[in-house]
Amino acid sequence: MSFRFSLTHTDGAARAGTIATPHGVIETPAFMPVGTQGAVKALTPRMLEEAGAQVILGNTYHLWLRPGADLIARRGGLHRFNGWGRALLTDSGGFQVFSLADRRTLDEDGVSFRSHLDGSAKRLTPETAVDIQACLGSDIAMVLDECPPHPSPRDAIAASLALTTRWAARCQARLRRLQDGPVEGVVPTNAGQVQFGIVQGGVYPDLRLESAGQLVALDFAGYAIGGLSVGEPNEVMYEIVGGVAPALPAAKPRYLMGVGTPTDILEAVERGIDMFDCVMPTRNARNGQLFTRLGPLNIRNARFAEDDAPPDPECACYTCTHFSRAYLRHLHVAGEITGSILNSLHNVAFYLDTMRRIRQAISLGTFTEFKREFLSRLNQRADAS
C-alpha cells in the first residue's frame, strides 16, 4: 500500500480523514504514542494495538546512538525489530541534538556534537538523518531541521528557518538518491517511505508563513509544524498554528510536533491539524497522574487508599474495567512496575479514545459542541470529587 492522504469530512477548519501507509491506515486526527527507544514505555505492541493505536513514533537520535541504525537494518528494519506491525513515523533527531547533546557545533553542512551516552563525537547532516531513517524503515520520515531555543531574536530565527529550508531540500534529494538505487553503507528497509517537511519560524507569524511557502514549493508528502510547545504561551502557539495551517496544502496531512495536552490537541484540531505526538500520557502515568474525562487524577493522593472506584468510570480500557483507584495507588506507592504499566495503558487509551471521539464529532458536524463540552468537563478535577 503506497502513501495516500484522503479527507473524508470537514467541520469548519477541523478535518477527518485517512492516511494510507505501507503498514496500514491511520485515521486522522491521530495521536502517536512516543516510542523513544523503539518502545512506548511500559507498553507492548499488543497493548498499544488493543488500545487503538494505529501509528507510533520512533526517535532517530536515540536509535542511532543505541543500538545503531545498521544493526536495526540487519534485523529487517524497526517494524521487525520491535514487533510493531502498524504505521511508524520517525523524527530526524534534530530536536534531541539541539536539546540533549553536549558541545554542539552548527554549520551549513550539519551539526557536530558529543553523545549524551558516552561522549563520543558524532556528526549529523541532512543526508545522515535520511540514511538513518531509511535503515529504520519508518513509513514517514522527518527532514532534519534546526531547532533554535525559545526565546530567540528574530534575526536568529530568520537565519535558522533559511537553513532548515536548505536542509529540507538536501533531505529530499538524498531520499530520491536512495530510491534510485543502492548506496554503499545504507540498507533501506521500507521502499514506500515518504518525507514530511518541518515549518519553523519561532513566534513570528510572517517568518512562519515564509517557511511554509518555501517548504510547500518543495512538495513534500506532508508538513509538520515544529518549534512550538517549547515555553511560549498557549495563546501564541494557537495563533501560530491558526496562521500556518491554512498556508499548507489541504490535500496533505498536517502534523503538530510534540503537542500535547488534550486541550492543546482540541485547539489545534479546530485549526486544521491532523497529527500529534507527545510523551505526556506515559510520562505522567509513571508519575501517578491519570487523565480522565473529569480532569486529572493524581493517584498518589492518600484519599484513594480505600477508593474502590475505577480510575475513570467512563473509560472502557483494561485498567479501568479491572482495577480500582485503591489498587493503583498501592502499586504506585510501592514502586511496583505494574502500576506504571496499568497507568500508561489507561492514559494512552484515554488519548486514543479522545481522538476517536474527535473524528466522530467532525464526521457528524458537531465538533464545536463536542469541544465545548469536553473542555468543560476536563477542566474539573477528578481527584477533588
Where in the sequence are the language-model features?
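Non-catalytic, usually N-terminal nucleic-acid engagement modules in DNA/RNA processing proteins
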Residues: M1-T189, A302-A305
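Short acidic/polar active-site loop segments enriched in Thr and Asp
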Residues: Q54, D139, A221, D274, ...
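Glycine-rich phosphate/ribose-binding loops and adjacent secondary-structure elements
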Residues: A162-T165, R174, L178-P182, N190-P311
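Surface-exposed helix-capping loop/turn segments at secondary-structure junctions
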Residues: R174-V186, K252, I358-F370
